[in-house]
Amino acid sequence: MADYHNNYKKNDELEFVRTGYGKDMVKVLHIQRDGKYHSIKEVATSVQLTLSSKKDYLHGDNSDIIPTDTIKNTVHVLAKFKGIKSIEAFGVNICEYFLSSFNHVIRAQVYVEEIPWKRLEKNGVKHVHAFIHTPTGTHFCEVEQLRSGPPVIHSGIKDLKVLKTTQSGFEGFIKDQFTTLPEVKDRCFATQVYCKWRYHQCRDVDFEATWGTIRDLVLEKFAGPYDKGEYSPSVQKTLYDIQVLSLSRVPEIEDMEISLPNIHYFNIDMSKMGLINKEEVLLPLDNPYGKITGTVKRKLSSRL
């Protein structure tokens, strides 16, 4: 029988690159009651902690470990006593708690995702306590803080599905013996936006308003003017245009990462049925799909 405890001792030829442990998908619904007017935040939170020692890994010594069940309970208690003004502020509260409460925690990383509830509204009148789930882009954030430094905050949008039926094309690409894709001047353009940005400072930032502004800018650049749209020669160009517009309009952010899958819709051939399909009936194709990514940041000279 293998002697696991004796065979796997500290190895001087190895070193840790990074360690962490925590609790994922801690779900909370926080209700703020101001008389009969109620406000809600529902979130899913994941917490990762890094400790100053590695004795739990090296020797199976658990004396420094904060149980992950305790981490879960802490998230619940912080929601009660701190509330959830924004998911970014909540993430900072969690990081600060673990770093200030446990001297051997040297790094805290928190991911928070907000479930998209929207208050019911009719004819300009907002309901006092009823909400509807509106999955038109998910707000998420990542907060990381080291013991020796301030929190670093990323915010983002994911699962924002958008489509336009014209004002998009793809021409002038490389053609070789394996190319079957024809050039096209007019096509459907559909994607599911993933967009993440970093704040260069966290004081006096209205995270909720900034997120809403960037979401509006993404939609503005994708769609173009409401009466005529805006032509996109490639997904790459649209991606970059979104980044340029966002960093020019939102001075609080330092960089932006975007991922845009190119979700295909193909014209269905009806010629065998004696019909001409003029891009009226299309076939959505989930897989495979193109994926275009890009990250930009402000040049150092632009920050001086």
From Swiss-Prot:
It catalyses: urate + O2 + H2O = 5-hydroxyisourate + H2O2. One of its GO terms (cellular component) is peroxisome. Its main location: other. It comes from the Eukaryota. The keyword Oxidoreductase applies. The modification N-acetylalanine is found at residue 2. InterPro entries: Uricase (IPR002042), Uricase_CS (IPR019842). The modification Phosphoserine is found at residues 39, 63, 232. The modification N6-acetyllysine is found at residues 10, 23, 27, 36, 118, 122, 164, 175, 185, 221, 228, 278. Its EC number is 1.7.3.3. One of its GO terms (biological process) is urate catabolic process. It holds the Pfam family Uricase. It is an enzyme of class 1 (oxidoreductase). The modification Phosphotyrosine is found at residue 289. Keywords: Acetylation, Oxidoreductase, Peroxisome, Phosphoprotein, Purine metabolism. Pathway: Purine metabolism; urate degradation; (S)-allantoin from urate: step 1/3. The keyword Acetylation applies. The active site is at residues 23, 68, 264. The modification N6-succinyllysine is found at residues 10, 23, 221, 228. Urate binds at residues 68-69, 170, 187, 235-236, 262. A motif (Microbody targeting signal) lies at residues 302-304. One of its GO terms (molecular function) is urate oxidase activity. Belongs to the uricase family. Catalyzes the oxidation of uric acid to 5-hydroxyisourate, which is further processed to form (S)-allantoin. This is Uricase. It comes from Macaca fascicularis. The gene is UOX.
